[in-house]
Amino acid sequence: AVTTSADTIGATISEYAVGSMMPEKEGELGGHLYIVEFLQTDVSQKQLDMFGETLDGELIKNNEDYKAHRSEGFGLHAPVIFDVPPGSFNAWMKKRDQLGGQHKVPRIINDHDLFRNLRSHMGHSSA
């Protein structure tokens, strides 16, 4: 889904990670935050919006559970896309002494502390 979405906007992803965004207030929906590093430095907001819409559509099409949670505002809002400059993930991995060797950027981060650390490093402050 991520690659298809990048192809739609003519961009190439070098790294990405996704984690959950918990509701902050009563009645809010949760969702997922995709932190994405493109090889290109000129990805526009319009392209990011298209990337997010395509990603959401691909996930709905290919994942019945996701589709059920996205239907009629039940449980999940559309994915939030946060793009970061090239080299951002390498800097984060280096900061954690995880750059190189067998270490890879985790794609799906279920550890809330680790995801909070990544968001903080990348400059994304919301839950």
Model-derived features: positions:
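AMP-binding adenylation
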Residues: 1-127
